[in-house]
């Protein structure tokens, strides 16, 4: 497999791992927390849109489509399903219609940034996430679902 594609797949797995930690044990009403700009559910919807856009751009359709947020559990599911579809495309031999570097520097980097934003909002909402050493985390390409391995070195 192409090294660039494989690295982008590892990046998607990293995104899935970090987001799953951010969403894990979030209060039921966290998606509607307000007081810091967009609500978490709106941010998560945007993140799902970014991943769909990355997938579609890689397939040759770079048109942007913003969606209305779904309820929190469905929005989380939509994100991870979009991530799995994009990962499957990268794992295939289908030629990409966009440079891997651009897919990383645009939608994927943006989604990683928003993952950190959601983690900060968890703290603002009074429900901080537990820290861990992400360098030691058991992250592997293709592991892009919401179910992730347990932390190797939690704080």
Where are these regions (language model features)?
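Short, contiguous pre-domain boundary segments
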Residues: 1-2
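Short, contiguous alpha-helical
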Residues: 5, 9-23, 28-66, 98-155
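Helix-adjacent hinge/juxtasegments
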Residues: 53-93
């Amino acid at each position: 497999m192409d090294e660039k594609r494989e690295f982008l797949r590892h990046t998607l797995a990293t995104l899935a791992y970090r987001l799953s930690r951010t969403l894990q044990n979030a209060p039921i009403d966290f998606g509607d927390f307000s007081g810091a700009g967009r609500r978490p559910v709106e941010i998560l919807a945007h993140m799902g849109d970014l991943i769909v856009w990355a997938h579609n751009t890689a397939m040759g359709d770079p048109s942007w489509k913003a969606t209305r947020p779904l309820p929190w559990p469905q929005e989380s599911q939509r994100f991870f399903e979009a991530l799995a579809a994009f990962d499957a495309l990268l794992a295939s031999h289908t030629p990409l219609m966009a440079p891997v570097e651009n897919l990383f520097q645009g939608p994927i980097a943006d989604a990683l940034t928003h993952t950190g934003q959601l983690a900060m909002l968890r703290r603002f909402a009074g429900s901080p996430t537990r820290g861990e050493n992400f360098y030691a985390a058991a992250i592997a390409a293709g592991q892009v679902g919401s179910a992730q391995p347990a932390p190797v070195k939690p704080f």
